[in-house]
Amino acid sequence: MADHPLIRDYGADAIFAWRDGRPVGVNQFLRDVTQLAATLPDRRHILNLCADRYRFLVGFSAALLRRQISLLPPNHTPNLIDQLARQYPDVYCLTDGEDEHPALSTVFYPEFPDYTTVVAPPVPSIPATQIAAMVFTSGSTGEPVPYQKSWGGLVRSARAEAERLGLAAHPGMVILGTVPPQHMYGLESTVLLPTQNGLAMHACRPFYPADIRDELEALPRPRGLVTTPVHLRALLAEPVRPPLADFLLCATAPLSPQLAADAEARFAAPLFEIYGCTEAGQVATRRTVEAADWRAFPGIALRQDDAGTWAGGGHVETEVLLADVIELRDDNTFLLHGRTADLVNIAGKRTSLANLNYHLNSIEGVIDGVFVMPEENGDSITRLTAFVVAPTLSAETIMNALRQRIDTVFLPRPLCMVDALPRNATGKLPRQALHELVTNLAARAG
């Protein structure tokens, strides 16, 4: 299998990235990668904790040159890092922060001089079969499990994404992301998507609506935003109109058609959703205002058996059993009906937590909300519970709205108003976080 270049489709004077309000050229990036690669220890595995997206990419690229595998766990808690240290004894940490982890030797990201006037080294090529990263399941379906990602698979994914989303119509677009690069969605769509298609990446990761608006407004057009439903909902809840954009991309949970239409109108840009998982990477897309169906990427085949739905082919190098209930419409289009583990059966009636969450979050005034089915506990009756962030609404108002949307057997008992939900950096709610919510509720009630 052929090699693939580290970066692709950049002219000599092209802007490669934006950082601290200033453009970074291709020459600077290639010099930074070469310099950092020369300083990395001779190890097999690297834990790249750089929060700055540009520095993360320099570290990821330098590791590729040294044939090192980047470990990308779902979180960076001390317990998980200790677990990685036991599982991969030679792993070391690259960070641009001040924290050191006792279990790991640490390399602090150095400051490099300005190389803009120096001739850059040539763009290196990386073997397609080289293992570039080890990504881990998010923890929302159990304990993290590692999955290898080859450089060739990652490159094919990034190029297929750009083609599907029509980004050739926006040469030089700057991609701003609200998701971290250490997660599969962030790696694919805020790091590899721009660098394999001649686009510019943005180094920062704004979180609050005002910061997202400010960072996006400061960028030249064309500009795109890669985000999550949580960030998007918070942005649109603000009275301030967001800056115009040329492209919106969302993932980690399905959007409602209403929210998607509102986003397209407010940003004056098309919004696309990505469906995927850590195990397979990105699998399908849809433009939510046009269709509920998802369309698989070229080359990806879906098949079903008694175990569920499998995805393989294209950039998905090993066939993967998807964790969702999927209705195949034809060879490459399908509908999602929630996660397999989310099916709820009460009084002979069936639905999914995803469907219930959809209706809960479609209520005007609900900023965030989630249904939870607690684990059965002895002889006590297990009831659906909902946790809702809605500062302007009462629990009674929300319950009345739910009665208009869902069968009464699925109404939450209780419905708990909270200040915020414990989402992780990509907007997901890990199983352990939901368990703690329910446990704390039971402790207060008991």
Show where each model-derived region lies.
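Conserved AMP-binding/adenylate-forming core of the ANL superfamily
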Residues: H4, Y10-L40, K149-G152
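Conserved pre-ATP/AMP-binding loop-to-beta segment of ANL
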Residues: I7-A12, D114-F136, A168-V174
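Conserved AMP-binding A3 loop
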Residues: G25, P124, A132-R159
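Conserved AMP-binding/adenylate-forming
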Residues: A37-H76, M173-P181, R350
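AMP-binding/adenylate-forming
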Residues: Y88-G97, Q148-R164, H170-A234, F272
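Gly/Ser/Thr-rich phosphate-binding loop
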Residues: A237-A291, A301
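AMP-binding/adenylate-forming catalytic core of the ANL superfamily
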Residues: A323-F410
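Conserved C-terminal "lid"/linker of ANL adenylate-forming enzymes
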Residues: V344, F371, T385-F387, A401-G446
